[in-house]
Amino acid sequence: NTNTGLSSESFYSAITLTNDARLNHCTIIHNNAPGICAVDGQLRLYNSVLWGNTSTGIIAPEDVQITGSATMLDIRNNAIQNAPEEWNLWSENMQLSVVQGDPLYPAFVNPTRNVGAVSSGYDTPLGGPARFEPTCESPLVIAGDESIVGDPDLALDADITGHNFAVGGAPDIGAYEATCLNPVGSVLYV
């Protein structure tokens, strides 16, 4: 789902959690605040991407994507731009780059084909919605792992648009499955 809102609360973020939360295959990007603020409770986050959430309006490597004081964190197999170092997330998660061309830069489908879209790929003031499905070159592709979820209620077999996961192997990280891969698993040369 797409969510838009304004907040001046002290714990502002794209998603503010005050209780236990279990999230799988979420795409939380390009918000004018940290992506998640886990104020209290337990946060279980899997196969999700948090990138480009910034309080300054300019994406920078030091922008914190997850913040808060949750009582328990289980954050595995995600692609995250930055998080507090004391959370020690980098052994089980991918740390994304903000530098275009870097292998860990999360390339998304370019929405400039829409009328009124701009080259940043995020703002479409006169046209259709931005498309945040990963491109085939993105590190998010075939990087998901449903086996770590451990909860049948969170296990998914399709993305937010209905495309089946695991096209070409493992599912992609995030809410969208890349559609550039051949859905039947064979290559046709012409």
Model-predicted segments: where are they?
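Active-site and glycan-interaction determinants of carbohydrate-active enzymes
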Residues: 126-173, 180-182
